[in-house]
Amino acid sequence: MPKGDIVLIKFPFTDLSGNKLRPAVILAVTEMDLTVCFITTQLQWLEATDVQLMLNSLNGLKKPSLIRTSKIATLDKSLATGLLGKLSTNELEDLNNNLSSG
């Protein structure tokens, strides 16, 4: 799973009260962990450092979405349940730029 892959993962709530299965984009992979940004369809939450994703054949998403660069987590690989798709070259470039400017 390289950087830019979109996976389904059990993502914890920020208050740790539970989790939700949601898409996330991989930022880094180690032997046991994945570092990811979560993806949301709540377009009204748009922040300056978010990356907007439109539907395309590459990403496997069902709705227009946002990569929330402010929502980064390192999670055990076992929480990832499936590969949805991957970011396009332009989307990955936008993600890298937004991560470094945030």
Task: Give a label for each model feature.
Residues 12-16:
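Short, charged beta-turn/beta-strand-edge "cap" motif at the junction between a beta-strand
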Residues 17-20, 26-57:
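Compact nucleic-acid interaction/catalytic patches
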Residues 23-24, 68:
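Short hydrophobic/aromatic-rich motifs at helix boundaries and adjacent loops
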Residues 58-102:
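C-terminal terminal-subdomain/extension
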